[in-house]
């Protein structure tokens, strides 16, 4: 049976669920308390991350490399429990590159369901039963008739610490804002009804690329100048203005609402505070949504509003406390094991896995710790830095020049180096493997249609066109542009004996076929016929253009006539037995087969009728 805030069972007799904190943490060391206090449902890897973050003076998550407000516990827990952080935690543990917030946003916007992307990155958990036993800090627990229930802590009003009967007596009034990519939706609920709502979409991110245009511009690669980039940049600015306009129009409602739920990327949050809506950065009413959401629209907002009101049942109070006691003991033992192992191994990295094989183990055997498996992973050996005299800034500029096909700037960039570094720089251009796909500069030039740089690398730098990237493709296969492929083919023609061309995938150039006299004669006749057709087409085009000019002159002449002159011309043609004038009386264009008429006038459209009546009210 599902319960909500509107369930009649909770109108009275609701008591907060209390934990004996002194008994729970009794005998625990300072390090253990840090681990035990991480009341989250993200497993042991999340608790270790929590301990690491508390020991540093920073405002950035070291796993996701994104800003996090460590002064707000709710925001902190919401980040650590999010799919974004859990995904990056697993990827980092497997020595994989972590997602940026923009890339992960692009994955959520893609056509594939987010569940499939979890499967792709291997986001499966073996700790589901263990996680379910933890007491999440983002939920508020209460007791009713000997059973334990919980609601999202975010729905409590400012100043409320625990759930009471008042929580269920009042309407669930709030404002919800969802913004992801170019999709925005907002709504306000008053007296349990949606009173105002607004949703729209703008093109601000390239399909399946992830990230809005402003994030791409600030990524260090320079602002793109394509028509699509300019359109996305314009749409993003208009989108911000529309959102601020909506919030300004709702200002009086927003100042009265007790809760504000906002779900958006971190770099978009300031937009809500900059609007003239009376919302400040540290507004105590602002809440995060404690679950994943889909594409922003009005239906999704309604679904969020319903899910925020759901009440979860956790069984009898005695059973629930017994489960908590068991979990507390397991966490104490694991904390001691982790702390001792860390002191012993020093620089070792630890990955702790939990096994539930001891669920039925006798209590007298608590000292056994075979259910804790501790693996140690040695730090990888430091790799030798290639080309040490070429700093990161120089390499980044080189990469940008190649992408922009600025070969002259690239040459000047190389010439700025000392003579003793030139050979090292040329070796870097020939052999550098650029992450994440281990692409060479030939791959980068071909993929970005940088034809000038491509010729420079082939003919002057002598780059190897058979070197393959991380996907096993040579530079020739990195582009579908026919002009780029022609550069590779021309290079092969000039250097046919240079090496094994089969490895480069560059095809042989087409050989010219010797024609017989008859074939040459037929080819000449076809060219002659084609030329005649082209000449006839040009002649016809000129005639049409001439007729259009004459028609425009006649039309302009007719439009410039006064009403008296038009009527006189019509009478003269009727008396002379000539056909009537088949032109619109207002704009002068030729009339359609069935013109619009009123009085004795003919018009081409209703707009012309309206304009004529407006100009001639009598």
UniProtKB/Swiss-Prot annotation:
Residue ranges of the TM segments: none
Active site location: 213
Any one GO BP annotation for this protein: ERAD pathway
Keyword Ribosomal protein: no
Keyword Mitochondrion included in the entry's annotation: yes
ANK repeats: 437-466, 470-496
Broad class of enzyme this protein falls into: hydrolase
Xref: InterPro entries: ANKZ1/VMS1, VATC, VLRF1/Vms1, Znf_C2H2_type
Alphabetical UniProt keywords: ANK repeat, Coiled coil, Cytoplasm, Endonuclease, Hydrolase, Metal-binding, Mitochondrion, Nuclease, Repeat, Zinc, Zinc-finger
Assigned EC number: 3.1.-.-
Chief location category: cytoplasm
Subcellular location: Cytoplasm; Mitochondrion
One term under GO cellular component: mitochondrion
Domain VLRF1: 170-311
Pfam families xrefs: bVLRF1 (PF18826), VATC (PF18716)
Basic and acidic residues bias (residue ranges): 505-515
GO molecular function, one term: zinc ion binding
Residue ranges of the region described as Disordered: 502-539
Zinc finger feature spans (C2H2-type): 59-85
Coiled-coil segments on the chain, per record: 510-557
Tissues and organs where the protein is expressed, per its UniProt entry: In larval stages and in adults, expressed in intestinal cells, specific neurons in the head and the tail, and in the ventral nerve cord.
Family: Belongs to the ANKZF1/VMS1 family.
Function: Endonuclease that cleaves polypeptidyl-tRNAs downstream of the ribosome-associated quality control (RQC) pathway to release incompletely synthesized polypeptides for degradation. The RQC pathway disassembles aberrantly stalled translation complexes to recycle or degrade the constituent parts. Dispensable for viability and growth but is required for protection against oxidative stress and for wild-type life span.
Record note on domains: The VLRF1 domain mediates binding to the 60S ribosomal subunit.
Protein name stated in the entry: tRNA endonuclease vms-1
Gene responsible for this protein: vms-1
